[in-house]
């Protein structure tokens, strides 16, 4: 058995670290199989040496987050514990130091995981970035945040967001109403990110000036998109032909981010995903990056990680090795 004590700088810091009703400490006890005793600003752990060491590292990581004004939400604490188990809690500072943007309500945006940080670095460095991962990893929201930042910095003159309207088979002419009414239901997730980052009023003004364009993928055909930050969301639902069409729209001074989840393909049976195809065909092209986010990067409710993991395992069990090659290569 080993024992370690930690004296925090103040009662206020201790209260924030411990959480409401010592919630965070109870999580640490369960995760690392240690016993914790809290007295004032002092915290004492007892248990197996490696477990006590990991628990102390987790507290160090939480202190780092608090010093950088990062709220200790449940998922943040769980990620901190995950890094502490591998002795990487010091890398949390890399996340808090990586500033992306500020929302319309003044909330600063930082990557919440090391995978997200890698994704942002790839977007900054490359003309084309593929962000592939399950729901909840922030791949679309962070891409939109980077687009808004580039627009505000005048690195680009417009933002273009698109996704395949696969639910309507992209045959939007058969739907009632004008174009905007037809496509809004399929593009709503993209609007949500823009509203959060810009505010509804600013978004509307930029939209009316055509500085922001949100449109289904079918409406990209035949265009050259210069000086723009272009995001293709839900790319797993493109065909190889659609993906090639989209990527070749890129013009001078533009940056492209393609996001998707290869476990959520809604294409007709036996139709190959354009995302899987592109990941394979373009893997060695300079200036094109591929970042794989995993369940470790999920920043929603803790159950989402377990749900994602279960579905991925089921998909791998059902998928022939040849079809899965583009998904499994270069996994982080």
Walk through the language-model features, giving the residues of each.
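Conserved helicase motor core of SF1/SF2 NTP-dependent helicases
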Residues: 42, 104-114, 122-232, 236-332
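Hydrophobic side chains in well-ordered alpha-helices
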Residues: 17, 55-58, 243-246
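Short amphipathic alpha-helix segments
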Residues: 13-30
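A short, structured beta-strand/loop element
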Residues: 29-37
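Short glycine-/aliphatic-rich beta-strand segments at the starts of folded cytosolic domains
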Residues: 1-16
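Interdomain "pre-motor" coupling segment immediately N-terminal to P-loop NTPase/helicase cores
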Residues: 37-96
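Proteins enriched for Cys/Gly/acidic motifs involved in redox and nucleic-acid/cofactor modification
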Residues: 78-112, 117, 124
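Short, surface-exposed acidic/glycine-rich loop or hinge patches that mediate macromolecular interfaces
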Residues: 11, 22, 49-50, 237, ...
